[in-house]
């Protein structure tokens, strides 16, 4: 009986017993219970049906025993061909995304890796053909298991390997564990939560959170205003335009959206007093964002993204406690909208030119 092309493809469907998964996806527990589903899904790379493994890893952090359920997304053949994890599709050696790894190897190696690859082809039949040919090569020469001839990882020169190591060290903390023989190191931005909170508390204690625009400070050297309640959709140019129109020339404007606050420094004390006088009760509304404004000298608003984020959470919590939260926090504080500037009436659309 003559076999058809569909029968040949079915013969090459993958049925494996053990997946190729990185240590990050496996979790901290060396004893993992997995479920196996034969031909459970199509491979994300070659589109052939393959054996799907599912498991629930345990997290290494304290206070949380289990992570989210994981499964294999690519077949073992494509995993060997790309030298990547079947679950997260990161490089098994360096923990890098495949696009970054291949781009780094292409820069270091002359000529790149010729021939067809799964990433360069979009046709389903071509992908299956490439996977089948590579599978035959694996059967003929088991050395290809460690020598990745398609991506060139196994044949990378020392310069390319050095570049990959540098990229792996520069990637986020979860990829540093791929470096063998190194201890668990955390970057500066991933410090202990208690130490981070203590540092941010010191920063927040120096900010004029309880201040206002009145009275005017006696110190004539203060020419800056502190504002908080900044949301992500409030651009810096809107803030700059407002203070330029109400005050005058600005010498420095610092807006940290992650910390939900910022400073504006005027060139003269008179310009700062003029801008403060245009703000009623220390409250200002720009693009629907309710800001709190106060006199204050420029201070540090966090030297890292973690510090700025933590400071922003403290500021949002303070604003909610005072009933002056932004419009993104729901209905709280809607009845505390800032009154209009002195001398300007409120115009409603239904009243035409009538002023109240």
Swiss-Prot record:
GO terms for molecular function: pre-mRNA binding; U6 snRNA binding. One of its GO terms (cellular component) is Prp19 complex. Associated with the spliceosome. The keyword Phosphoprotein does not apply. The gene is SLT11. SMART domains: RRM. GO terms for biological process: mRNA processing; RNA splicing. Involved in pre-mRNA splicing. Facilitates the cooperative formation of U2/U6 helix II in association with stem II in the spliceosome. Binds to RNA. Signal peptide: none annotated. This is Pre-mRNA-splicing factor SLT11. Disulfide bonds: none annotated. Its main location: nucleus. Residues 223-298 form the RRM domain. Transmembrane segments: none annotated. PANTHER family: PRE-MRNA-SPLICING FACTOR RBM22. It is found in: Nucleus.
């Amino acid at each position: 009986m003559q076999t058809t092309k569909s029968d040949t493809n079915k013969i090459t469907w993958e049925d494996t017993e053990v997946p190729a998964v990185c240590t990050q996806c496996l979790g901290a527990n060396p004893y993992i219970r997995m479920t196996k589903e034969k031909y459970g899904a199509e491979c994300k790379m070659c589109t052939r049906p393959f054996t799907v493994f599912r498991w629930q890893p345990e997290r290494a952090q304290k206070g949380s025993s289990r992570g989210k359920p994981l499964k294999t997304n690519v077949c073992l053949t494509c995993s060997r061909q790309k030298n990547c994890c079947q679950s997260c599709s990161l490089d098994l050696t360096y923990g890098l995304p495949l696009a970054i790894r291949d781009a780094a190897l292409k820069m270091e190696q002359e000529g790149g890796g010729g021939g067809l690859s799964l990433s360069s082809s979009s046709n389903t039949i071509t992908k299956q053909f490439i996977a089948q040919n590579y599978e035959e090569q694996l059967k003929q020469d088991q050395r290809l298991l460690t020598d990745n001839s398609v991506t060139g990882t196994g044949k990378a020169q020392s310069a390319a390997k050095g570049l990959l190591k540098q990229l792996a060290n520069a990637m986020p903390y979860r990829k540093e564990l791929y470096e063998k023989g190194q201890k668990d190191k955390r970057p500066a931005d991933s410090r202990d939560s208690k130490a981070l909170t203590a540092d941010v508390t010191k920063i927040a204690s120096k900010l004029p959170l309880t201040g206002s625009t009145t009275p005017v400070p006696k110190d004539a050297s203060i020419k800056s205003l502190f504002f908080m309640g900044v949301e992500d959709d409030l651009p810096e140019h809107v803030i700059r335009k407002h203070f330029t129109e109400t005050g005058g020339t600005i010498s420095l404007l610092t807006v940290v959206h992650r910390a939900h606050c910022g400073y504006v420094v005027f060139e003269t004390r008179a310009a700062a007093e003029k801008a403060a006088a245009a703000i009623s009760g220390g409250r200002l509304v720009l693009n629907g964002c309710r800001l709190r404004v106060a006199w204050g000298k420029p201070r540090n608003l966090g030297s890292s993204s973690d510090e700025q984020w933590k400071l922003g959470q403290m500021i949002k919590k303070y604003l909610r406690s005072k009933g002056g939260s932004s419009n993104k926090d729901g209905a709280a504080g809607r009845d505390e909208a800032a009154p209009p500037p002195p001398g300007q009436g409120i115009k409603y659309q239904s009243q035409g030119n009538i002023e109240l």
